[in-house]
Amino acid sequence: MIGNIYQIEGGYTAQRVGERNLQAVSTVADALPMLLAGAPDITDIETLLEVVDGVLLTGARPNVHPSYFGTEPHPSHEPYDENRDAVARKLTRACIDRGIPAFGVCRGFQERCVAFGSSLHPENRDLPRRIHYRVPRLESGERHPYSEVVFADRHGINLLPGAFLISYLAVRQFAPRSRRCRLRG
């Protein structure tokens, strides 16, 4: 799991990972969750991959920097986390080269796609006929406090016959808990 950079009180930069991700790795994967620094100057990916059985690229608020998929940055699409971008890109490719499973959730899925040449739409709010995936808010404008509301099913997905996921999920339809999706190409 790669840390997500954020500012704490006093302006100090910190890295964190969501409790839901830690619990999923521990209980569902029966594995020991480890936080990987989203800082390329202190992250030794080769050494890390000698001791892990898999990698989870988690979600995060910052967007993948558009320079990775041939689009110009724009202030309305910020924030970006170029340090995490650099670590995730190198880590994703190294996992594939070594045959180590690397699963992506939310931004992590976007990082995997971009690492292998796909592009993203920089902001799905700009797309016609989009589905709104943002975090539910209270009437006051504050983020909804209950995770079962924030991560509730949002829409259905129908897999095409022969889709790769059918062999793993054993279903052709399901409702993911997605909040944003910008993949294209």
Which residue ranges define each predicted feature?
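Glycine-rich beta-to-alpha active-site loop
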Residues: 104, 109
